[in-house]
Amino acid sequence: MKRSLRLSMLGAATLLTASSAAACTIFSVVRDGHVLVGNNEDFTRPGIVWFVPSSPHRLGRVNVGFDKSLAEGSMNEKGLCFDSTALPKVPWRGDVLKQRPKNLLDKIMDECGTVAEAVEYFRKFDCPPLGDAQFLFADASGASAVIAWLPDKGLSIVERQGDHQIVTNTRLEASGYRCPRFAKAEQVLAARHDASVETMTAVLAAIHQRGPGGFTSYSTVYDLPARKVYLYNLADFSRVHEFDLTAELGKGAHTLEMATLFPGGATLADVTAGEQRAEFSTRIDLPPEVLERYAGEYRPDIAPEVVTRIERDGNSLRVKNSGQPDATLYPETETTFRIAPDRGTVSFRVSAEGIVEGLTLHKGRDVYATRVAVP
């Protein structure tokens, strides 16, 4: 137990992020009456977009993905939108009393117009894909929620707090760990105060991937009230193809390969050449006096015999444990630090009076520690 906790406090476990090939990012932004959803679809194949007109028992919609048998993302004519991210696989338990549709996501997009209705379908029906995927749903009113599955809880529904919601490839309720792409998206949104296509693409550009191990195949921005889709291919944000959903549905069912929409644009050879882009600069500078206030000794609440010492080291913090290698923490916000290079995050608990009371290590789970001494 003691050694395990020391290793946890040093962030010595393996990375929690998904592989580059499946590391996607979704976010919704609600500001000044605008409701937008952005997505980077990171994979190793070119994308397609297809339109499905309405019928007496089905809402019309636009789908994006790689195979018409499975939509990775979608928006229907009511302004309900979803996209998905891959997750580390966990045991999923079905409910024998619940029906299991062939494809619950299709059923929701065919029949629902709001996030509340979508969430109710997840409560009503079984959804086996939740074992290794999660879904962000958003609607034209601005509501959004992330639906996932936790082995110790079951269905996890996290609604938007504040003016945006972000999800990458970790379960939000499993721990407070957020990957560098998540942190970078937060930083870009904090620096820009509007909800515009330009702001959405600024986020997407900051967190896109490229390289032989996986790349951003396509990116989408959905304007839910306007029922419009802005499509970008292979992380080339200088070229956009805009779709009006109502107009496209009026053309009947049709499918488009994304590459054909961007003649002369980026190619697969362009985005797979060179080194893999998998790191995102999230480090910020903090004044020395802010860093100094976190120095001291901390003891994990579940094992108070373990002592972790933290001291300022230039523009970072250094973590010391007897008999273990030192670890470096670099700041991403005034109270949140990443264990370099990305072995977890640490958030410091600061009282309203500015007193540092403890910290929380965020990894596969959250480990709380109390500050017991100052320098």
Give the residues covered by each predicted segment.
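A broad structural signal for short, well-ordered beta-strand segments within beta-sheet-rich domains
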Residues: 24, 71, 355-359
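C-terminal, well-structured catalytic/ligand-binding subdomain of enzymes
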Residues: 25-110, 133, 138-282, 290
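Short N-terminal edge-element motif at the start of the domain
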Residues: 106-112, 117-120
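Sec/Tat-exported extracytoplasmic proteins
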Residues: 112-113, 125-129, 211, 298, ...
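Secretory/export targeting leaders with adjacent low-complexity proregions
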Residues: 117-136
